[in-house]
Amino acid sequence: MTVLVVGVGNIFLGDDGFGVEVAHRLSTKDLPDHVRVVDYGIRGMHLAYDLVGADHDLTIMVDATQRGDPPGTVYVIELDLPEPADTGGPAPLLDAHGMQPDVVMGLIAVLGGEPGRVLLVGCEPASLDHRMSLSPVVEAAVDTAVRVVTGLVGSYPFGTDEELTCALASLAK
């Protein structure tokens, strides 16, 4: 059983550096040997290619992702590959300097990959301005995300959606 935790984001765009900061903090933690933490930064295409032939049982992506929640909200979403009908057209718009998790998953599908189970630990950004620091509310959410990721790693494997829901509920306490 292997778990890959990936920090995604651009440290030059304020809160977009959230995933990178979480990965850096996780790299200082004493995690089980089967867990690998990698800062992918803006190398979304590299991440997609690494996940195409993934030998990981679980990948946890950590990224700032806009969902319309209050800034600093941390959430966990299970990501799925798009349906084949959704990838029959042209390849998704690619930006070699950064890709949202859904675009990474779309590229994996276009390439015919099977990434295994993929979770997104996301945080609602407050500001994506050109600066090299997180906003105070997102900075405060980094510790929450670290706790969520370590909790997910500690409770894995969870085979069913119900077990994942229970793991997430226990983290909320």
What do the predicted segments below correspond to?
Residues 1-114, 120-123, 132-143, 152-173:
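N-terminal catalytic or cofactor-binding beta/alpha core of small enzyme domains
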Residues 149:
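Hydrophobic "lid"/C-terminal helical patch
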Residues 128-129:
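Short, solvent-exposed loop/turn segments at secondary-structure junctions
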